[in-house]
């Protein structure tokens, strides 16, 4: 009976982590594709030049892959050391997520202030050499989200000159449409537009967050249950 429970738990744990590992592979693939095909699109922040969408997806995909692999191997080999490592990694990730979430809400005003200032500093690099990625990133978000600048279109004046904004700020994009024509440009800043997008999609994002939390808790529960079941059977393993 005990052996049957062990086998059942083992294969449930293996299947769970196989899906987890495949998700990591998918994220890693998407991140590499973004890095290769969209390599000229970079971050908006001069303080964190490596914090691009591609690098972020690659990092998350790698963590998920490694964690899933540990879980798969620990389950199929019935190795307590690997199962414990899997549990500890998930616990660390969960605690880190909770700490970051708490800090974000506690210091939300400070985060908003620093983020806006950092983005404005990034605008100064818009037409400089070796910053084509930053320029492309701003052009895309302004065209796609119908916004201009960080807080509003006047953020571009110290960068491009009085009454001048990038052409992608224009409601109807055409060459040099942003020169001395502020009446036909998007007035809302991109920072506010992004906040509005998050607010409009908060239910979807909350659901995704809850699903991730449930998956992490299930993974920890499966690993500890299997760990205890292996321990009870009295099997011996090499650490």
Swiss-Prot record:
CDD domains: NET-5_like_LEL. Gene3D superfamilies: Tetraspanin. It is found in: Membrane. It is a multi-pass membrane protein. Its main location: membrane. Pfam families: Tetraspanin. The chain crosses the membrane at residues 14-34, 56-76, 86-106, 204-224. Residues 35-55, 107-203 are extracellular. Residues 1-13, 77-85, 225-239 are cytoplasmic. Glycans are attached at residue 180. InterPro entries: Tetraspanin/Peripherin, Tetraspanin_animals, Tetraspanin_CS, Tetraspanin_EC2_sf. Keywords: Glycoprotein, Membrane, Transmembrane, Transmembrane helix. Belongs to the tetraspanin (TM4SF) family. This is Tetraspanin-9. It comes from Xenopus tropicalis. The lineage of its organism: Eukaryota, Metazoa, Chordata, Craniata, Vertebrata. The gene is tspan9.
